[in-house]
Curated annotation (Swiss-Prot):
Gene3D superfamilies: Phosphoglycerate kinase, N-terminal domain. It is an enzyme of class 2 (transferase). Substrate binds at residues 21-23, 36, 59-62, 119, 160. It comes from the Bacteria. It comes from Limosilactobacillus fermentum (strain NBRC 3956 / LMG 18251). The keyword Kinase applies. One of its GO terms (cellular component) is cytosol. One of its GO terms (molecular function) is phosphoglycerate kinase activity. This is Phosphoglycerate kinase.
Length: 401
């Protein structure tokens, strides 16, 4: 999929509209984790270095009523961006109208402007009208009219069809490009799904089979092995007739799990032992069991034999995609499976290793292996949608080369 990228554009003197993902946590008017802002800096700096005018659009949180607006202003984000760039950043507290148009008209080459939260457009005169998140055609057209070029660097919203990504891009044919972050996501996730170096192994964790059915099915067609861990394991156990005690199970997904098991044959690798606990708490009594789990006990992590089995499968892999934890990662006594698998990924030589999803990303950070992995995806839902083989509207709307 050859899409226009920022390097294909002549930026000098141009008003460059940029969709970034600055949806960051804000407490008492201060940005908490600024990772997403930092991730967009290479593209922003490239535009400034090439004498473009960078006009940044992002959503922040969800806005369903007027009262939501004051706490979700982009002002603190603009202030943090100013610190990171070490230069002034203009913040415009509105999403449309003369105040915004005048501020853009006054910009000089190499300057940055941050537009107010795009989701302010979701509430008008007290009504929840979803102009931004419903991709109102007039809004996309209006925003597109404010610039000469468009760069989408917000992979995290690529699976959504909003006025600020699809709306703007579809009104700027031939002038909508991917930023560096978006380009990297398309390259690594895209190659993994469509053209992986083999053996290709996927590691899927997390609590619910229902969240991952599409991903499992798509990756069973593409991968050489699919390792399953985390809470969704026990719905597969139930489908195989293994007793699961009080472990998490989705009763209404047991039939789906059976179908997946039939389709998968020996491609699907399940844990062979589990760490079980007598209550859902870090200080629970625990033991390691193989096979059936007794009533009154629940599996909260994969066991030591499973960890070794998974490592054997991963040892020869040339492409690995990891999405989701192997156990209840947020409790230290049930984090071992996730941490050991992550640690092992960091040691693989000559393999492309891709991590997506909040918990897996957090595990990689905790282990200090982020720099040993090839790519850490910035999009949770967007990464999953990509791995499911979905067409992502935000990417589809970017101009082809």
């Amino acid at each position: 999929m050859a899409k226009l990228t920022v390097e294909d554009l002549d930026l000098a003197g141009k008003k460059v509209l940029m969709r970034v993902d600055f949806n960051v946590p804000i407490k008492d008017g201060v940005v908490g984790d600024d990772n997403r802002i930092v991730a967009a800096l290479p593209t922003i700096k490239y535009v400034l270095d090439h004498q473009g005018k960078a006009i940044l659009f992002s959503h922040l949180g969800r806005i369903k009523k007027e009262d939501d607006k004051p706490g979700l202003s982009m002002r603190p984000v603009a202030e943090r961006l100013s610190n990171l760039l070490n230069m002034p950043v203009t913040f415009v507290p509105v999403t449309e109208g003369p105040q915004l148009e005048d501020a853009i008209a006054k910009m000089e080459d190499g300057q940055v402007l941050v537009v107010q939260n795009t989701r302010y457009e979701d509430v008008k005169d007290g009504e929840y009208v979803k102009r931004e998140s419903g991709n109102d055609p007039e809004l996309g057209k209006y925003w597109a009219s404010l610039g000469d070029l468009f760069i989408n660097d917000a992979f995290g919203t690529a699976h959504r069809k909003h006025a600020s990504n699809v709306g703007i891009a579809s009104n700027m044919p031939g002038k909508a490009a991917a930023g560096f972050l978006m380009e990297k996501e398309i390259k690594f996730l895209g190659d993994a799904v469509t053209n992986p170096v083999r053996p290709f192994v996927a590691i899927l964790g997390g609590a619910k089979v229902s969240d991952k059915i599409g991903v499992i099915n798509n990756l069973l067609d593409k991968a050489d092995k699919v390792i399953v861990g985390g809470g969704m394991t026990y719905t597969f156990y139930a489908a195989k007739g293994i007793k699961i005690g009080n472990s998490l199970v989705e009763e209404d997904k047991i039939d789906v799990a059976k179908e997946i098991l039939e389709k998968a044959g020996d491609k699907l690798v399940l844990p062979v032992d589990n760490v079980v606990a007598d209550k859902f708490a870090n200080d629970a009594n625990t033991k390691v069991v193989e096979g059936d789990i007794d009533d009154g006990w629940m599996a909260l992590d994969i066991g030591p034999k499973s960890i070794e089995e998974f490592k054997k499968v991963l040892a020869d892999a040339k492409t690995v995609v990891w999405n989701g934890p192997m156990g209840v990662f947020e409790m230290s006594n049930f984090a071992k499976g996730t941490l050991e698998v992550g640690q092992f990924l960091g040691t693989l030589e000559g393999a492309t290793t891709i991590v997506g999803g909040g918990d897996s990303t957090a595990a990689a950070k905790q282990l200090g292996i982020s720099d040993k992995l090839t790519h850490i995806s910035t999009g949770g839902g967007a990464s999953l949608a990509y791995l499911e083989g979905d067409v992502l509207p935000g990417i589809a709307a970017i101009s082809d080369k």
